[in-house]
UniProtKB/Swiss-Prot annotation:
Pathway: Protein modification; protein glycosylation. GO terms for cellular component: Golgi membrane. Its EC number is 2.4.1.145. Pfam families: MGAT4_cons, MGAT4A_C. Glycosyltransferase that participates in the transfer of N-acetylglucosamine (GlcNAc) to the core mannose residues of N-linked glycans. Catalyzes the formation of the GlcNAcbeta1-4 branch on the GlcNAcbeta1-2Manalpha1-3 arm of the core structure of N-linked glycans. Essential for the production of tri- and tetra-antennary N-linked sugar chains. Does not catalyze the transfer of GlcNAc to the Manalpha1-6 arm to form GlcNAcBeta1-4Manalpha1-6 linkage ('GnT-VI' activity). Glycans are attached at N84, N215. It is a single-pass type II membrane protein. It is an enzyme of class 2 (transferase). The keyword Glycoprotein applies. This is Alpha-1,3-mannosyl-glycoprotein 4-beta-N-acetylglucosaminyltransferase C. It catalyses: N(4)-{beta-D-GlcNAc-(1->2)-alpha-D-Man-(1->3)-[beta-D-GlcNAc-(1->2)-alpha-D-Man-(1->6)]-beta-D-Man-(1->4)-beta-D-GlcNAc-(1->4)-beta-D-GlcNAc}-L-asparaginyl-[protein] + UDP-N-acetyl-alpha-D-glucosamine = N(4)-{beta-D-GlcNAc-(1->2)-[beta-D-GlcNAc-(1->4)]-alpha-D-Man-(1->3)-[beta-D-GlcNAc-(1->2)-alpha-D-Man-(1->6)]-beta-D-Man-(1->4)-beta-D-GlcNAc-(1->4)-beta-D-GlcNAc}-L-asparaginyl-[protein] + UDP + H(+). GO terms for molecular function: alpha-1,3-mannosylglycoprotein 4-beta-N-acetylglucosaminyltransferase activity; metal ion binding. Its main location: Golgi. The gene is MGAT4C.
Amino acid sequence: MFKFHQMKHIFEILDKMRCLRKRSTVSFLGVLVIFLLFMNLYIEDSYVLEGDKQLIRETSTHQLNSERYVHTFKDLSNFSGAINVTYRYLAATPLQRKRYLTIGLSSVKRKKGNYLLETIKSIFEQSSYEELKEISVVVHLADFNSSWRDAMVQDITQKFAHHIIAGRLMVIHAPEEYYPILDGLKRNYNDPEDRVKFRSKQNVDYAFLLNFCANTSDYYVMLEDDVRCSKNFLTAIKKVIASLEGTYWVTLEFSKLGYIGKLYHSHDLPRLAHFLLMFYQEMPCDWLLTHFRGLLAQKNVIRFKPSLFQHMGYYSSYKGTENKLKDDDFEEESFDIPDNPPASLYTNMNVFENYEASKAYSSVDEYFWGKPPSTGDVFVIVFENPIIIKKIKVNTGTEDRQNDILHHGALDVGENVMPSKRRRQCSTYLRLGEFKNGNFEMSGVNQKIPFDIHCMRIYVTKTQKEWLIIRSISIWTS
């Protein structure tokens, strides 16, 4: 049974580490993992004495050197519970029903520029009428300056009154009394004191926003207050989520910049909110989000291209400094996300390491990579159910490896799936066409093929000395 003196020893270690300005990321992560495991596994254990729980809470509060932190961390023994914050509703109508997606924005007063209104406008303008029924937007005006908040609320209500009335837009504020100490914090990474205060408060801003949004929808996407959206971004997100049904994931990424476009299950938001609060002064928010993903056992980044969200602010919310970061994978105009129906994939090519066949068929930014193929080698997709295909697009090679394309190949479609000892396969194939410069694209397939398609096959027509990357296979169905 877990002894309290062991827990006390852990806190002593943590206390010593707090005095070290220069410490490795590895040591921090080690302590972080141990701390979370003990807190989550042992404090939740029904056999831990209530008195010990109280001592643990008092010790953790002392470690954070903040009497005002007691109410925030009183529920550490239940990471799935909500943080006790009484929010101020600055502009909102009661949420009548749970939505599919909540879009969360946190905003503070900037020394230069203000992009919040443009961001909200982009969210609504880039969504169809049907999509608007499935989203809610929550704006956390997190600045402690009440005059600025009042002015922003007036602007928001004037421009987006109908969205507020429809329950699609809520503007909230978490009062300053709920915040931990923000002055005199540790200067990790030799950051200046004002930057440490800024990023630490930002972590708490987002923690309170996540806490509020935990029950408003099935999924939650995190944006900044200076972002432009792609057309019909919700439809694209829904297709991606559907394609990952049955797959474990914690975070899906729809932008490669900071914490823009990070998507979560809403049931994970309470844990994430607690996590940001616990380590609010340790590091920037995007770093903490990466650690959170890893602690919940999602090893690899799952990012999708093209990006759905673009950073548009020129001046940073920190000191008004210039911030010219852009996501070069962003596409603003509507793009057609493929359907890629459920299928099994196999190849007789020599696969390199873990670049397996399935990665070419996924929406994730990954690919298949094989050693030089020979005449007659195949890459086969067998669909779970017969489909009618409208369009096919296959791309090989990458920008970095432009020679690793299919130099000589064809694309076939098949019918009459036959069972076999090793795998299902089609008995007959019909050739649709040849690859040109490593790519294949054809529309109107359903007008050319007289049967429902059971299989699709990439066929190597000539041996090549170059390796082969199949970057993406996209299929649109009728």
